[in-house]
Amino acid sequence: MAASGSGMAQKTWELANNMQEAQSIDEIYKYDKKQQQEILAAKPWTKDHHYFKYCKISALALLKMVMHARSGGNLEVMGLMLGKVDGETMIIMDSFALPVEGTETRVNAQAAAYEYMAAYIENAKQVGRLENAIGWYHSHPGYGCWLSGIDVSTQMLNQQFQEPFVAVVIDPTRTISAGKVNLGAFRTYPKGYKPPDEGPSEYQTIPLNKIEDFGVHCKQYYALEVSYFKSSLDRKLLELLWNKYWVNTLSSSSLLTNADYTTGQVFDLSEKLEQSEAQLGRGSFMLGLETHDRKSEDKLAKATRDSCKTTIEAIHGLMSQVIKDKLFNQINVA
């Protein structure tokens, strides 16, 4: 019974995150030093600022990053990723946490973190992990996956001196709320570069107090298409992890775990609606009503989408609780 429940929980998680199994463990883990040196010497990303289009993350690297992000609670955490490059794809093989000071809005790396980083990479090479640092990750607890002004500056600096490099952002709070990993991978454009107009990106809820920071810098970077993979070794390790932790799925509730997050979402939504109402009220006394109305209606439409998202997540959490109650608390004894 426990084994079947564990297997079902693992398959559900893998399907939700579109986890793909690598055809051969040697194929994905083989490190060709000569090939990597040739890529570094050619530097194709300098000729095309949109060169890297894909980001592949191993299942265990993903779990390590998400667990680290979740352990930080409402504080941001930071770590480094090891990997390699394969054409237009950046492959993240492993990750490790950094000893940094975190706040609710930023992470600050001190000298000790840089020393730890250098020592970790050196020791990893001694045990046969030849991959180099390929990026950094940090968390945005409760406010989505995007790059703030500080993140953009940090990533620009990394791309200037440590190419190839990618920035990954994880939202552990929304991951629990939605039941699917909320993660984004990004690369910045060089200073002064004006990117071509692109189609609308996937919509995500941005808190009112973060909208300005998001809007000012959103054209300075682009998102990579993220996918996840697992090898046969990953599969065995994941099975061991699921055998230990799958019961948490039944014993926990997103309604209780994320109660503060849901309350914050409702409060943020009320502020957005009040702001839109005030702008619509002023619009009747202004000239050029069409442009003003369109902006106000756009804000109302976004507030509606945010409301629907919060409602759906709450309903899913409630449905999960009802199903568990029916299964375990209302068994009719014949």
Curated annotation (Swiss-Prot):
Q: Which residues bind Zn(2+)?
A: H138, H140, D151
Q: Report the EC code(s) recorded for this entry.
A: 3.4.-.-
Q: Which Pfam families match?
A: CSN5_C, JAB
Cellular compartment(s): Cytoplasm, Cytosol; Nucleus; Cytoplasm, Perinuclear region; Cytoplasmic vesicle, Secretory vesicle, Synaptic vesicle
Motif JAMM motif: residue span? 138-151
UniProt cross-references to SUPFAM superfamilies, sorted A to Z: JAB1/MPN domain
Which chain positions lie within coiled-coil regions? none
Primary site of residence: cytoplasm
**Its GO CC terms?**
chromatin; COP9 signalosome; cytoplasm; cytosol; nucleoplasm; perinuclear region of cytoplasm; synaptic vesicle; transcription regulator complex
Task: Name the cofactor(s) required for activity, per the record.
Answer: a divalent metal cation
Top enzyme class: hydrolase
Q: Which GO terms describe its molecular function?
A: enzyme binding; macrophage migration inhibitory factor binding; metal ion binding; metal-dependent deubiquitinase activity; transcription coactivator activity
Q: Which processes are annotated in GO (biological process)?
A: exosomal secretion; negative regulation of apoptotic process; positive regulation of DNA-binding transcription factor activity; positive regulation of transcription by RNA polymerase II; protein deneddylation; proteolysis; regulation of cell cycle; regulation of DNA-templated transcription
The N-acetylalanine modification is found at A2
Superkingdom to which the source organism belongs: Eukaryota
Ordered alphabetically, the record's keywords are: Acetylation, Cytoplasm, Cytoplasmic vesicle, Hydrolase, Metal-binding, Metalloprotease, Nucleus, Protease, Signalosome, Synapse, Zinc
Tissue distribution of the protein: Widely expressed.
Q: Which residues form the MPN domain?
A: 55-192
Domain description from the entry?
Answer: The JAMM motif is essential for the protease activity of the CSN complex resulting in deneddylation of cullins. It constitutes the catalytic center of the complex.
More details:
The CSN complex is associated with some 'Lys-63'-specific deubiquitination. Such activity is however not mediated by the core CSN complex but by the BRCC3/BRCC36 component of the BRISC complex.
Q: How does it assemble?
A: Component of the CSN complex, composed of COPS1/GPS1, COPS2, COPS3, COPS4, COPS5, COPS6, COPS7 (COPS7A or COPS7B), COPS8 and COPS9. In the complex, it probably interacts directly with COPS1, COPS2, COPS4, COPS6 and COPS7 (COPS7A or COPS7B) and COPS9. The CSN complex interacts with the BRISC complex. Also exists as monomeric form. Interacts with TP53, MIF, JUN, UCHL1, NCOA1, BCL3, GFER, PGR, LHCGR, SMAD4, SMAD7, ITGB2 and TOP2A. Part of a complex consisting of RANBP9, RAN, DYRK1B and COPS5. Interacts with CDKN1B, HIF1A, ID1 and ID3. Interacts with IFIT3. Interacts with BRSK2.
Biological role: Probable protease subunit of the COP9 signalosome complex (CSN), a complex involved in various cellular and developmental processes. The CSN complex is an essential regulator of the ubiquitin (Ubl) conjugation pathway by mediating the deneddylation of the cullin subunits of the SCF-type E3 ligase complexes, leading to decrease the Ubl ligase activity of SCF-type complexes such as SCF, CSA or DDB2. Promotes the proteasomal degradation of BRSK2.
Entry's family note: Belongs to the peptidase M67A family. CSN5 subfamily.
Protein name in UniProt? COP9 signalosome complex subunit 5
Per the UniProt record, the source organism is Mus musculus (Mouse)
